[in-house]
Each structure stands twice: as C-alpha cells, then as structure tokens.
Amino acid sequence: MSNNLIIINAHIVTPQGRTARKGEAMNELLNIPCGTVRVTDGIITYVGENRISHEKPGYKVLDARGNVLLPGFVDSHTHLVFGGFRPDEFIWRLNGDSYMSIMERGGGIINTVRATREASFEELKHKAEWFLDTMSRMGVTTVEGKSGYGLDRDTELKQLSIMQAINECPDRKVDIATTFLGAHALPEEYKGRSDAYIDFLINEMLPMIHQKQLAENCDIFCEKGVFTVEQSRKLLKAAQALGFGTKLHADEIVSFGGAELAGELKALSADHLLQASDEGIKALAQNNVVATLLPLTAFTLKEPYARGRKMIDSGCAVALATDLNPGSCFSGSIPLTFALACIYMKLTVAEAITAITLNGAAALGRADRIGSIEAGKQGDFVLLGTDNPHILPYYTGMNAVKLTIKGGRILHSN
C-alpha cells in the first residue's frame, strides 16, 4: 500500500510545535480553511493553501471536500494487554464498593494479574489487536501500552513482547509507545515486602528490559496503600539513569505528593491527578510535566474530575487519554473522553484538540515526530465528517471520524 498521499480541500486544524503546549498556548491552533497536505513515504512534506500541483505521479489524491483534518489522535495512557475481564467488580462498585476496597479483598489489579499470567501470548496479542482496531476507527494513530499485569519477570516480559511484536508488523494500524509498569501493585509473592519488590524491579527488571529494548518509559502507581513517594523516587531515578522516560500514576485516590514528585523528577507526565494539590499543579507547570487527565476513569468510578481548567490556567500542559483497562475504566472511547473533558473539566474545544494530539505525544516523548500536522512529522491524520471541529464534544460519545490515515495510508472509512 502506497505511503504517498495528497489531501486537498481540507479544513486543516492543528496545534504546532515539537514540544507540549502550555497554558494559554493550548488554545492556539493553525486554521487553514482550504488547505493541502502532501505525504511522501509516510512523512509530511507540505502543509499549506491549495497552491501545489495535485497531479503527481505515484501519489493518491484524497479530496477532503472541506471537512476538518486533524492530527491523528494520541491516546497516551492505556493498559491494553491483559487477560480476563472484571464485570463483577463493576457491579460491586455500583453497589457501593470503592476501588481500594475491591483491591483489599483480592480483586482489582491482582485479579487481572492472575488471568494475565495464565493467558497465552497469542490470546493476549489477539485481544490487544482487537482493541487497537477499535481505537483506530475512532482516530487513534498512536497509543501508549503499559505492562503491569504480570508483576513477575516472565509475564511482564510477555506483555512488553506482545506490544513489540505488534509494532513490528508493517501494516499495523496504530503505533504503540511501550511503558514498563512493573510497579502497578504489590504481587502476592511480595506481600509485606514492598521495598524488596522495588529492589527486584531496579536490579533485575529494568536492566533486562533496557537490554532487550522492550520499553521506552517507566511508570509507577504512587498512591497511598500501593507505593510510597520515596519508593517511587527510587525506582524512577533508577529508570532515568538507564535512559527511560518516566511517568507516574499520581494523586488518583488521595493527595499523596505524586504531582510534586513528578515535578521534582521532571517526568514526562503525571497521570490521573484527581486529587492533585495546588502545590502539585504548580510543580507540574514549573517543570514542564504533562498533566495527563483521564475523564473516563472519574466517570466510571463516580469520582470528582481532575481540575483541568485550573491546571491550564496555572500554566500546565494538559493531555487527555482514555485509561483503557479491565477494571476502573473498561473503555477506549475517544469521543466520550473528548466530551467529558469539555463538559466537566471545562476545556475549550481547541484545548481538548491540543490535549489529545500534540500534548499526548509530548507525554510519550514523541512530540518531535507526531501530534501535529507539520512538515517532517508522520503523516497521521483524522478526517472528520464535517467542516466544524466543534462536532467533537457536541456529538457526545459518538464517532465523528470519517477517515483514519496512518503514515499516509488510509485505514478506515466510517
């Protein structure tokens, strides 16, 4: 399939830059009502008015007919490789159980750990590919995939190897940025020995994953009852010393100092942040840490939404992601994520577009190559079925994507 494409008559709407956009700059979008984009060998080589020749040998020509052309969506926080499902826990939550109380009675993450350890490589890979196909139809062209449902050497490596295998497929629909999340929970084998488990991750897992080049980033669940701030600092500093980008699940359940730690370490991102303090928000803004907000999780858990408006007004770079996982948020719905962010977190449409494209890319350390429609970046696009980008939150929870284009290849026509 050719990776040479010329898109004409497109209403181009895109953030610009090779780093995250912060604060007021999140509202600044390039807007070309009738533009052309040229992609050569999968890379954007021209963006501008309809002034170049549309007839070029070896290029497919796509007439956008005035519809909105956006950068491909970047879902920068998912847990897409896992065994089993947990529908019963969803019902327990409806009946009043909390996320942490379910974990304390042996459910939650540990439930999925057991199922993931038992599942075969092919079973897990097939399920992940199904999720990716579904997400691609909603405009996702790059996704983050975390491990963290193994909590032992072999299963963590299995999860990461599955994502590597998908990335090596030449006709893949979505690129996966892999994140090692061995510190997702304390495995049963290490009950009461959390320091020893952190040492195992530092001394055995990180060097092995680094040598095998199985992950780009390292994450930890920094939360009361899971891993402490000091344990998180120790693991992430070790990861940084090996060249990993660092990320944190931070301040989701209680205000715990995770955002402050992310600022101290100058991490790529701090995620969740439902309970982030004012000082934590300030630390994120001052240290250029992307605040990755996950409105679907707050929606599912019936928790207050993260203070997206406050974060942007404080100078933060905010990203949006789905948090697809089998427990707290069994959804990869980009349309609903977009709507909830605008309705409940009070993001403008322009801010939400930036959050789910360029800032999502920055949260993965990839803003230099994806996240905006600019020469030199990958030819990843979303073509909407309308000329008005405001359709994204207005068409609440419904898919407004007409075409998904990956590296110049047209993947889906909805």
Swiss-Prot record:
Alphabetical UniProt keywords: Cytoplasm, Histidine metabolism, Hydrolase, Iron, Metal-binding, Zinc
Localization, UniProt: Cytoplasm
Pfam families the UniProt entry points to: Amidohydro_1
Residues given in the record as 4-imidazolone-5-propanoate binding sites: R86, Y149, H184, E252, S328
Catalytic activity: 4-imidazolone-5-propanoate + H2O = N-formimidoyl-L-glutamate
GO biological process terms held by the UniProt record: L-histidine catabolic process to glutamate and formamide; L-histidine catabolic process to glutamate and formate
Residues holding Fe(3+): H77, H79, H249, D323
Top-level EC class: hydrolase
The keyword Membrane appears for this protein: no
Note on cofactor: Binds 1 zinc or iron ion per subunit.
Pathway linked to the protein: Amino-acid degradation; L-histidine degradation into L-glutamate; N-formimidoyl-L-glutamate from L-histidine: step 3/3
Similarity field: Belongs to the metallo-dependent hydrolases superfamily. HutI family.
Name the UniProt record assigns to this protein: Imidazolonepropionase
Organism listed in the record: Phocaeicola vulgatus (strain ATCC 8482 / DSM 1447 / JCM 5826 / CCUG 4940 / NBRC 14291 / NCTC 11154) (Bacteroides vulgatus)
Gene field: hutI
